[in-house]
Amino acid sequence: MPEGFSVMNPYEHADVRRVVTTFCERYYGGSRQRLPVWGINPGRYGAGLTGLSFTDPNALRQDLGIESAIVGRREPSAEFIYTMIDAYGGPASYYHDVYMSALSPLGFLRGGVNINFYDDAGFMREIVPFVIDCMRAQTSYGLRTDACVVLGTGKLKQFMERYVQPELQYQKVHYLEHPRYIMQYRRRFIDDYVTSYVTAIRDLVGN
């Protein structure tokens, strides 16, 4: 790790491992090939706490029905994602079709503040093999290999096209605006973004 960086690994906590196990048993059963939806890396108030991408403690209890001692504030990206999931038909329908994760299952802090791995050019280059290995490992669970959705249209798109696509070679990659960007800068258009998410995912799923 570069000087001043630290790793955020939610899976070192027993309650997080229990939550993730409960979630997978409840929502990821069966042998269906799910569409991968990739984010960046865990943030402090979402997956960094719960171990589940774009899921804060509130969504964990209220939307997924999983009780836990994990506490934390409402996280904007989780708020958007679970609004979208509700529009899709609810968690059971959504996770029947979709596997949602991140390019890196570990989060990163610099000076105690959340950072995306691509925000530091040197660190970004060094983390590429780790990201590819993590994506391949998750794909081996039985995910679709022909298509995916990526939540990010700026630096994450550039990272995908430069480093990931040559390795995983998806035939179709659909890029959507990141939930954080929507909630911070385009919140008044949230309904339009929810519709665009649901439409894009349903089109790729074939529903």
Put a short name on every predicted segment.
Residues 1-147, 154-162, 166, 184, ...:
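A polyanion-binding, active-site-adjacent surface
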Residues 168-178:
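Short hydrophobic/aromatic-enriched beta-strand-loop microsegments
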